[in-house]
From Swiss-Prot:
PTM characteristics: N- and O-glycosylated.
Membrane topology summary: Peripheral membrane protein
GO biological process: cilium assembly; cilium movement involved in cell motility; flagellated sperm motility; regulation of brood size
Family of this protein: Belongs to the tektin family.
Organism classification: Eukaryota, Metazoa, Chordata, Craniata, Vertebrata
Coiled-coil positions: 424-458
Species assigned in the record: Bos taurus (Bovine)
Name by which UniProt lists this protein: Tektin-3
Pfam family for this entry, one: Tektin
PANTHER family recorded: TEKTIN, TEKTIN-3
Length: 490
């Protein structure tokens, strides 16, 4: 019989009473029969906390109750308390058959329970052994996998370290040759300045010497050559800067990957050496459901392999760039030196030509001065001769004038008269001739003076040109950088 809504006065709420002789002692039954019904905690009603809300099952048959009752005994079903204490003592709930069947059922259930328990113990022991072996094998497999993982990480870590060392060495070498390139580029400024100053000084040449000669052509070629070399150096300098940036980027990726590998190596190596008795072993509930992985072994290996391949590619490009920079340093140094020698040779030839022209001008000037002196002496001689001839003319003319005073018939055209007339004409013609020769000599002297001035000016021009080319330009060109400095070595 199942009773609901029992109060705290129920018999099951108090200690178990002492067994009577009506039923066999409980101690005579099997231990498995004792307390075969599980104990239930009584939960209280939410509306009536003093009333339990559970129930229990006493028997499978419902007893027959007295159908007759008085009005005062009629109560609602919700407040009725069908307990033993409220029933009549003449009412019995079970029959002896029920009692024997209950015992038999309990005995059978006891045997079944013991058999099931024994089988459960055997199966459980076997299960424990199987699971223990399986767990140990699983842990061994995990340990082996961790060991293999540690070996893989160690392999890739060594590969990264090897490539990182090579990349660092290559970057250092590229940095060194970049510095050499920068020094070589700085060394080209002095020759360029010298060439430009030579052109500037040669603009101060005078007169006819301000000529577009071979020296000027070679100087302009030298300026163009140095500028072209500077452009190539600057181009390779920009390439070196960009390549250094690429090398450092690849190096950064390798260093980052190496740092991750080292951290992973420490973690996995620690996990690989963890045992059941190790310190720090604890429960982390739900950790197996957290999947924070971002790669698989294939993508993991490919990531590092790509980093190494990228670094190797950048190293190859860096090595090729270093060779190109070395070649351009040698080529530009040779080009500038060859052009420097050409300019110097042109200067030497031009200086020799100018010196020879100057010497010739000096020779002509000396001859001109000598000729001027001779011409001046000639002019003085002509003037003296004219003065001397003037006296003869005056004497002849005076004679003729005096003879005009002869009286009458004495004015005879005699030989003396004729001779005096001829003498006057002859002396006058001589004087005219001498005067013409004097004018010619004076013109010649003026021409010689002009030639002298021209030669002196030309001599000054040549001296100025020689001073510019020999003293100014060639003195500056003695400080041209050496080949070692032009290729970037100190």
């Amino acid at each position: 019989m199942e009773l609901l809504g029992s109060t705290l006065t129920a018999t099951y709420a108090h200690p178990r009473p002492t067994p009577t002789n009506f039923l066999p002692a409980i101690s005579t039954m099997a231990s498995t029969y004792r307390d075969r019904f599980p104990h239930y905690n009584l939960t209280h009603s939410l509306s009536l906390p003093w009333r339990p809300s559970t129930y229990y099952k006493a028997a499978s048959n419902w007893p027959t109750l007295d159908p007759y009752c008085t009005r005062s005994q009629r109560v609602s079903e919700s407040t009725m308390l069908p307990f033993v204490s409220n029933r009549t003592t003449l009412f019995t709930r079970y029959t002896p058959d029920d009692w024997y069947r209950s015992n038999l059922t309990n005995f059978q259930e006891s045997n079944t329970s013991r058999h099931n328990s024994e089988r459960l113990r055997v199966d459980t022991s076997r299960l424990i052994q199987d699971k223990y072996q399986q767990t140990r094998k699983t842990q061994a497999d995990s340990t082996q996998n961790l060991g293999e993982r540690v070996n893989d990480i160690g392999f890739w870590k060594s590969e990264i370290i090897h490539e990182l060392d090579a990349m660092i060495g290559e970057t250092n070498e590229l940095t060194d040759i970049k510095k050499r390139l920068e020094r070589a580029l700085m060394e080209t400024e002095a020759p360029l300045q010298v060439a430009r100053e030579c052109l500037f000084h040669r603009e101060k040449r005078m007169g006819i010497d301000l000529v577009h000669d071979e020296v000027e052509k070679e100087l302009l070629t030298e300026v163009d050559t140095i500028l072209c070399c500077q452009e190539r150096m600057k181009l390779y300098l920009d390439k070196a800067i960009a390549q250094l940036a690429a090398n450092r980027a690849a190096q950064h990726e390798l260093e980052k990957d190496l740092s991750d590998k080292q951290s992973a190596y420490r973690i996995d190596d620690k996990c690989h050496h963890l045992r059941n008795t190790s310190d720090g072993v604890s429960y982390f509930h739900g950790v197996e459901r957290v999947d924070a992985t971002v790669s698989v072994p294939e993508s993991w290996a490919k990531f590092t392999d790509d980093n190494i391949l990228r670094s190797q590619s950048e190293r190859a490009a860096s090595a090729k760039l270093r060779d190109d920079i070395q070649n351009v340093l040698v080529v530009t140094a040779n080009e500038m030196w060859n052009q420097f020698n050409k300019v110097n040779l042109a200067f030497t030839n031009r200086i020799a030509e100018t010196a020879d022209a100057k010497n010739k001008i000096q020779t002509h000037l000396a001859k001109t001065l000598q000729e001027i002196f001779q011409t001046e002496m000639t002019i003085e001689s002509i003037k003296k001769a004219i003065v001397e001839k003037s006296a003869f003319l005056k004497v002849a003319q005076t004679r003729l004038d005096e003879r005009t005073r002869r009286p009458n018939i004495e004015l005879c055209r005699d030989m003396a008269q004729l001779r005096l007339v001829n003498e006057v004409y002859e002396v006058d013609d001589t004087i005219q001739t001498l005067q013409q020769r004097l004018r010619d000599a004076e013109d010649t002297l003026q021409s010689l003076a002009h030639t002298k001035a021209t030669l002196e000016h030309d001599l000054a021009v040549k001296a100025n040109s020689l001073y510019i080319d020999q003293d100014k330009c060639m003195s500056m060109r003695r400080s041209f950088p050496s080949t070692l400095r032009l290729v970037g070595f100190c």
